[in-house]
A protein has these predicted regions:
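Short, surface-exposed amphipathic charged segments that create phosphate/polyanion-binding patches used
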Residues: 140-149
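Signal peptide processing junction and immediate N-terminal pro/mature segment
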Residues: 1-18
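Short alpha-helical segments and helix-capping/turn motifs at coil-helix boundaries
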Residues: 35-38, 152-153, 176
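A short, structured loop/turn motif at beta-sheet edges
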Residues: 158-163, 195-196
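Generic beta-sheet signal
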Residues: 48-50, 161-170
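A short, acidic, amphipathic alpha-helical segment used as a generic capping/interface helix at domain edges
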Residues: 148-160
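Histidine-centered catalytic micro-motifs
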Residues: 53-58, 168-175
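Active-site-proximal alpha-helix that buttresses catalytic centers in soluble enzyme cores
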Residues: 16, 22-130, 135-139, 181-214
């Protein structure tokens, strides 16, 4: 884990779980999709899933959480969505509307790129939750990773409102802390099926451009 840079804390390049059967040690599941894309839409239209997005593409990719000048109250001090990221957000929202995917809660981090992705895609967000934030370090210790896992796990394992899907728009490192999967590229979504208790099952992953073709 290394602050949205895709590198691990020991300086080596992070694993590339998006295309491999990577073991997710935090929950003991494999990241291989367990459902065909052709049936994914029908499943999520029934509700009951957590859809975790990493925010869409930014102009630059660096660990701004470690910048002492960064303020969560000042968007100008943070990474900004790029033209591509703005387009991705709009297209995700249009696909959800066109395919009538039911959305209940929309939970975002306190970072501007997170809630702006939500505003562009869905026109709103329900709740800002600091548990989705980065810890203010570029490199994380084992205790930092455990803290992020403790913070985020309840959000991923709690069932959504009946007949809806819960959308979470967050960041890479907190998601990796819980699942062992580095969410790449920016804008990728993971479909999770919570057990209503302390865990969940990873169902599939969807790239920003794939929502329109489900």
């Amino acid at each position: 884990l290394n602050g949205e840079t895709g590198a691990s804390s020991n300086g080596s390049k992070a694993e590339a779980p998006a295309d491999q059967k990577t073991k997710t040690p935090a929950i003991g599941l494999t990241s291989e999709p367990s459902i065909e894309k052709s049936t994914l839409l029908a499943s999520i239209k029934n509700g009951g899933y957590i859809i975790y997005f990493r925010h869409t593409t930014t102009e630059r990719d660096y660990a701004d959480q470690a910048d002492p000048l960064m303020s969560l109250d000042d968007c100008s001090s943070q990474r900004k969505l790029s033209t591509q990221g703005i387009k991705e957000s709009y297209e995700i929202g249009m696909a959800f509307a066109a395919k009538e995917i039911p959305v209940g809660e929309i939970i975002v981090s306190e970072y501007c790129r997170s809630w702006k992705t939500a505003n562009l895609a869905f026109g709103e967000w329900t709740q800002k939750d600091s548990r989705l934030n980065f810890l203010p370090y570029e490199d994380y210790t084992k205790s930092h990773v455990e803290l992020m896992k403790k913070n985020v796990m309840p959000l991923l394992s709690r069932a959504p409102l009946p007949g809806t899907n819960k959308v979470i728009i967050g960041h890479d490192d907190p998601f990796e802390a819980v699942t062992g999967i580095y969410p790449e590229p920016q804008g990728i979504a993971y479909i999770l099926q919570p057990d209503g208790g302390k865990s969940f099952k990873i169902i599939d992953r969807v790239l920003p451009s794939e929502w329109a073709t489900l």
